Swiss-Prot record:
This is Gamma-glutamyl phosphate reductase. NCBIfam families: PRK00197.1, proA. The keyword NADP applies. Pathway: Amino-acid biosynthesis; L-proline biosynthesis; L-glutamate 5-semialdehyde from L-glutamate: step 2/2. Keywords: Amino-acid biosynthesis, Cytoplasm, NADP, Oxidoreductase, Proline biosynthesis. Belongs to the gamma-glutamyl phosphate reductase family. It comes from Clostridium botulinum (strain Alaska E43 / Type E3). GO terms for biological process: L-proline biosynthetic process. Its main location: cytoplasm. Catalyzes the NADPH-dependent reduction of L-glutamate 5-phosphate into L-glutamate 5-semialdehyde and phosphate. The product spontaneously undergoes cyclization to form 1-pyrroline-5-carboxylate. Disulfide bonds: none annotated. InterPro entries: Ald_DH/histidinol_DH, Ald_DH_C, Ald_DH_N, Aldehyde_DH_dom, G-glutamylP_reductase_CS, Glu-5-SA_DH, GPR_dom.
């Protein structure tokens, strides 16, 4: 039997058990998963070092190496994330609403698991742990297909997590990893409709578009970034500088990092030299339009391709705009619908930006880096959805459920 189909069958069987697992059973599994992760930390870090060595040989960027890297602190954070899930409300079984019809029928809408979730992702081994924990708490089985860059790390993490699941008494096939990282296997997984109920890609634009174009399994499209910060003519310069530096440099290889800076022309000559100097102190390469190049020296000319590009690196594109309307128009044309921010002390401009920018998260006077399940109070997230169907924004436990109708009668016929 095809190995992928076997994993699908096992996941489907596990999903029927998880569907009816109690909150205490799922929480016990999460606690044990966290314990096993820490018990195996030396082994996991050793396997991660193999991935890092391979990545360095391939000339992987510093920012991408940071995404791939695991140490004791990050493993402790991953285990802590599993424990935080224990404290979150279990969405399964919640009756969202209920009403009574004139014929006496009582109709309720109840949260239930999706079933089997497939996740295709790239070089972030922490996703392995986050996805496993979230899916299990929401009563779903999960099949993971990580990138080749993190294969040793992922195998070690899944081995530890599965030990915890098995020890708790829940099905050991609640979590499975596809160890074959070939594109052919990924394409086959995208068409496994009989077993996978929904597919969630996490990674760069190339991966996400490949899944969207090739999958026959329903897809929830997640977060290519290209986030913008617009500095309005009535912005506080110190606040703007702090937000821009944080949004660009704290973790440049994540999807909620700032990639583009738009500056109102009325403040450009005063503000741009300051912010460009601050960015260069953080080793950020600055690319700008022709107007930016007139104000600042040693700026690389931005091309049309730059405006729609997610750099995931210490690079920023800067454009001078005439007013807030041009900023909004530019964002809605080139943005990915992820996270966008305005820095302003003008209330009317802040409201215009909130209402007219088409994105999952829109900020006034705050960093785009807050678009995150934990920061929003959801606990960990499975990804940031940039589409509008089913889920939008950080996807926590509720977004990993669907609904069914439950109807109580006393003999009604139609």
């Amino acid at each position: 039997m095809n190995e992928l189909i076997l994993k699908g069958e096992r996941a489907k069987e596990a999903s029927y058990v998880l569907m009816n697992a109690t909150t205490s059973e799922k929480n016990d599994a999460l606690i044990k998963m966290g314990q096993k992760l820490l018990e195996n930390k030396d082994y996991i870090i050793a396997e991660n070092e193999k991935d890092l060595e391979n990545a360095m040989l391939k000339g992987t960027s510093k920012a991408m190496l940071d995404r791939l890297s695991l140490d004791e602190k990050r493993l402790e954070d991953m285990a802590d994330g599993l424990n935080q899930l224990v404290n979150l409300n279990d969405p399964i079984g919640e009756v969202i609403t209920m009403w009574k019809r004139p014929n006496g029928l009582q109709i309720g809408k109840q949260r239930v698991p999706m079933g089997v979730i497939g996740i295709i992702y790239e070089a972030r081994p922490n996703v392995t742990c986050d996805a496993a924990g979230l899916c299990l708490k929401a009563g779903n089985a999960v099949i993971l297909r990580g990138g080749s860059e993190a294969i040793n790390s992922n195998k070690a993490i899944v081995k530890a997590l599965c030990e915890g699941i098995k020890e708790s008494g829940l099905p050991e096939y609640s979590l499975q990893l596809i160890e074959n990282t070939s594109r052919e296997i990924a394409n086959e997984m995208m068409r496994l409709n009989e077993y996978i109920d929904v597919l969630i890609p996490r990674g760069g634009a190339g991966l996400i578009q490949a899944v969207v174009k090739n999958a026959t399994v329903p897809v929830i499209e997640t977060g290519v970034g290209n986030c913008h910060v617009y500095v309005d003519e009535e912005a506080d310069f110190k606040m703007a500088e702090d937000i821009i530096i944080n949004a660009k440099t704290s973790r440049p290889a994540v999807c909620n990092a700032e990639e583009k800076l738009l500056v109102n022309e009325k403040i450009a000559e005063e503000f741009l030299p300051k912010i460009i100097s601050a960015l260069r102190e953080k080793n950020v390469e600055v690319r700008g339009d022709s107007n930016v190049m007139k104000i600042a020296d040693d700026v690389k000319e931005a091309t049309d391709e730059d405006w729609g590009k997610e750099y995931l690196d210490f690079i920023i594109g800067i454009k001078i705009v005439n007013n807030i309307d041009e900023a909004i128009k530019h964002i809605n044309r080139y943005g990915s619908g992820h996270s966008e921010a305005i820095i302003t002390n003008n209330y009317q401009n802040s409201q215009k930006f909130l209402q007219r920018v088409d994105a999952a998260a829109v900020y006034v006077n705050a960093s785009t880096r807050f678009t995150d399940g934990c920061e929003f109070g959801f606990g960990a997230e499975i990804g940031i959805s940039t589409q509008k169907l089913h889920a939008r924004g950080p996807m926590g436990l509720n977004e990993l459920t669907t609904t069914k109708y439950i109807i109580y009668g006393n003999g009604q016929i139609r």
